[in-house]
C-alpha cells in the first residue's frame, strides 16, 4: 500500500490540469479526489480518456465535474487477497482507495503493488 506523499490526491476544487499533473507525478494511473479531507471520488486514466473524447475544452473543467464519485474502497485492515477479489469484481479495476476505520483516506493500492508483493 502506498501512503502519505506517495498517494496521488487533489482537492475537489482542483482543475483537470492539476489532477493530470498529480497523476503523472505519482505513477498510479489515478488521483484520489478529496473534500475537506474525506474521499469524494477518484479520477483515473480511463476517466481522462472519456473526458477528452467528450469534446470541448476539458482543461477548463473542474475535477469534481469529471471524477468518478464511487471509487472502489477497501479498509486498511483487510488482507491483500481481499484487494485482489475486490479488483476482480466486475467492473474490474486496477486501483483501490484505502480508508481507515473512520473512513478517512489511509492510502492507495495498485495491482502492480500486489504483483511486486507476489500476492498475484
Predicted segments with their positions:
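Hydrophobic pocket-lining "lid/loop/helix" segments that shape and contact the acyl-thioester
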Residues: 2-4, 17, 28, 38
Amino acid at each position: 500500500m502506498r501512503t502519505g506523499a506517495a498517494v496521488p490526491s487533489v482537492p475537489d476544487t482542483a482543475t483537470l490540469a492539476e489532477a493530470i499533473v498529480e497523476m503523472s507525478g505519482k505513477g498510479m494511473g489515478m488521483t484520489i479526489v478529496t473534500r475537506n479531507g474525506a474521499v469524494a471520488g477518484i479520477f483515473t486514466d480511463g476517466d481522462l480518456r472519456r473526458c477528452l473524447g467528450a469534446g470541448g475544452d476539458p482543461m477548463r473543467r473542474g475535477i469534481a465535474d469529471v471524477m468518478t464519485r464511487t471509487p472502489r474502497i477497501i479498509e486498511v485492515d483487510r488482507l491483500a487477497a481481499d484487494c485482489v477479489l475486490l479488483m476482480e469484481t466486475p467492473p474490474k479495476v486496477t486501483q483501490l482507495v484505502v480508508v481507515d476505520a473512520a473512513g478517512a483516506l489511509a492510502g492507495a493500492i495498485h495491482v502492480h503493488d500486489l504483483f511486486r508483493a507476489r500476492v498475484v
